Amino acid sequence: MDKLYYMGIDVGSTTVKLYVEDQEHQCIYSKYQRHYSDVKPAIESLIKEVQEHYGNLPVKVVMTGSGGLSLSKHLNVEFVQEVIACTKTVETYIPECDVAIELGGEDAKITYFESTLEQRMNGTCAGGTGAFIDQMASLLQTDAAGLNELAKNYETIYPIASRRGVFVKTDIEPLTNEGADREDIDISIFQAVVNQTISGLACGKPIRGNIAFLGGPLHFLSELKAAFVRTLNLGEDAIISPSHSHLFAAVGAALHSDFNITTTLSALR
């Protein structure tokens, strides 16, 4: 019997994530990539990349994410809701998780894994998300990685409101005019994201136990994650940082593909 492979594709508001594993659940390929609102070519390029490396693999495919439903119909593959996909990954790989904090391009989520699953989500405003961080980085003439690098050497955290960028400028500009160090401004932006996420989503409900940090911003921006850890006063043993934390929905989609129709990479392009 030929080997089968399982592919999960997560289409978010700003990025696409692709994850492929074999029958032993070993990852053979994964990629996190911005799509710049041009989703189909981005996915096609990722599938082409897999095919160039591994040939025309037989695959079972499931899509997920905020932009995945219509595209799944176009490609004639199954779709699974993102919360279901992420929950599957958590239950499979980090069952000890009590709460997951996830930041995406234009949404933020806190999921409580208790006797009943409870997810709280901000999907209506970009404040406190990856898009907000990008906007602030652009305002300061850098990128998210640049913010992160400078934030490593901060000394003071200033109050900044993580709301719409046009309002945040009124907090940042006085700091700049008064000569505040860039390192301090950058960490203050990250702290604003933390405050917005915790106050806006948890709404007083305790975030405790083993905490997983998921999504691209928390995977790639070490100082943003560190700001969450400081604010929640977490010990090292309470922090869960999976190796594929930026791909969790795509991994969950792949895990859901067991019973789907088998196709090939070339048929998806």
What are these regions (language model features)?
Residues 46-59, 197-209:
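Phosphate/pyrophosphate-binding loops at sites that engage ATP/ADP/AMP, CoA/4′-phosphopantetheine
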Residues 79-83, 228-251:
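Conserved phosphate-binding/catalytic loops in two-lobed NTP-binding clefts
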